[in-house]
Regions:
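Outer-membrane beta-barrel porins/channels
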Residues: 1-179
Length: 179
C-alpha cells in the first residue's frame, strides 16, 4: 500500500532569469496499517498481532509534513540551472525503530543541484544530483515491557536498543524528446 500524499505549491517568476518555487506536502503514513500501526501490536494475545491486519504490528511511523524550496536560473535559451532544498522530520518515533531497520528512512535534509541543456526545440537533457544529509535515530527496539513473553531472560525489555543511520547520494540523467 502507498500512503495518501497531497500538497500545495506556488511558483513565482521573480525576474526573466529567476524562478522561485515552494511546496508543502503531507504524507499520511497512519492510513496504512503496515506502516502506521505501532510494533506493540505484535505482542497482542490470541494471535491478533499479525502484520498488516487491523490489530497487527506495523512500522509505527508518524504522518509527516515535507517542505521544499527551489530556485531556477535561466542562463540562456539552451541552459537552465536548478537548486533545491527539502526538509521533513523523520517519521519514526524513537520507540518504534525495530521494523524500520528494513526501511531506514531517517534522512531529514536534502539538497538538489541540477542543470538542463536544450540543444534544440525538441531535445532536452537534464542532470541532477541529490544529497540526503546524514541523520541518525536511536532508541528502544520497542516500548518497554511489550516483548517480555518473547524474551523472558533478557535484562532489558526485549531485543534492546536500535540505531539507524542513513546518508544518500544519487545522480540522475534524463533525456526528453518533445513531439
Amino acid at each position: 500500500d502507498t500512503p495518501e500524499t497531497f500538497g500545495l505549491g506556488i511558483a513565482v517568476n521573480l525576474t526573466k532569469k529567476f524562478d522561485f518555487a515552494f511546496d508543502w506536502q503531507r504524507v499520511n503514513y497512519s492510513d496504512i496499517k503496515a506502516i502506521g500501526l505501532p510494533i506493540e501490536q505484535l505482542a497482542l494475545p490470541n494471535g491478533e498481532g499479525f502484520l498488516g491486519e487491523d490489530q497487527g504490528a506495523g512500522f509505527g511511523w508518524n504522518d509527516r509534513n515535507v517542505y521544499k524550496v527551489g530556485v531556477k536560473y535561466k542562463h540562456d535559451q539552451k541552459w537552465d540551472f536548478q537548486l533545491g532544498y527539502n526538509y521533513s522530520e523523520s517519521p519514526m518515533p524513537n520507540d518504534q525503530l525495530l521494523f524500520s531497520t528494513l526501511a531506514p528512512a531517517v534522512t531529514e535534509h536534502h539538497l538538489t543541484l541540477g542543470a538542463t541543456y536544450k540543444p534544440s526545440q525538441s531535445v532536452e537533457w537534464t542532470f541532477a544530483y541529490v544529497h540526503a544529509f546524514n541523520n541518525r535515530e536511536s532508541g528502544l527496539a520497542q516500548s518497554a515491557g511489550q516483548f517480555d513473553q518473547f524474551f523472558p531472560n533478557e535484562t532489558a525489555d526485549g531485543p534492546g536498543d536500535v540505531e539507524l543511520e542513513m546518508v544518500q547520494d544519487s545522480i540522475e540523467l534524463t533525456f526528453a524528446y518533445k513531439l
